[in-house]
A protein has these predicted regions:
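Short acidic-aromatic low-complexity motifs
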Residues: 1-25
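Short beta-strand edge/turn micro-motifs at domain boundaries
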Residues: 96-119
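Short beta-strand segments enriched in hydrophobic/aromatic residues
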Residues: 26, 82-84, 101, 117
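A short hydrophobic beta-strand element
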Residues: 73-84
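Beta-strand residues in well-ordered beta-sheet regions across diverse protein folds
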Residues: 33, 79, 113-114
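Short, solvent-exposed coil/turn segments at beta-strand boundaries
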Residues: 24-26, 73-75, 103-110
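Short, cysteine-centered beta-strand-loop-beta hairpins and adjacent loop/turn segments enriched
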Residues: 84-95
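A solvent-exposed, acidic/Ser-Thr-rich amphipathic alpha-helical stretch
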Residues: 20-69
Length: 119
């Protein structure tokens, strides 16, 4: 798979709720630097996996709507909106946030991420 295809696999519908999928696509030494509306986070592999677990507990569906995706060698940039459906209200789709992320891949896995998000 190309770097772009690997990133698309990571953001396909419901993938962020699936520990197995996320784990398979993350490099062992992955680091995600995330600037959110709540502040700065620097996440390692286990912390990213913990977020996946928490998302799976809170939401029954996760949908990523990618508006832009660009690939240059082992680097992929993605602009997307993340929508979810809650267990309490499965018919209503809610916007979680808008995201822009640049992923560097190593050995066909997500290695370094630089992400910004805003609700």
């Amino acid at each position: 798979m190309s770097a772009k295809e690997i990133v698309q696999e990571f953001y396909k519908s419901d993938a962020l709720l699936e520990n197995e999928t996320v784990s398979r696509l993350l490099h062992d030494d992955v680091v995600l630097e995330w600037h959110s509306s709540k502040g700065f986070l620097k996440l390692n592999r286990q912390e990213i996996m913990n977020i996946t677990t928490e998302l799976a507990k809170a939401y029954i569906r996760s949908k990523i709507r990618i508006t832009h995706i660009l690939e240059e060698e082992n680097t992929v940039s993605v602009r997307y909106s993340h929508y979810v459906k809650t267990i309490e209200n499965p018919r209503e789709e809610m916007l979680l946030a808008h995201f822009m992320v640049i992923w560097e891949l190593k050995n066909d896995k997500l290695y370094k991420g630089y992400q910004m998000s805003q609700l």
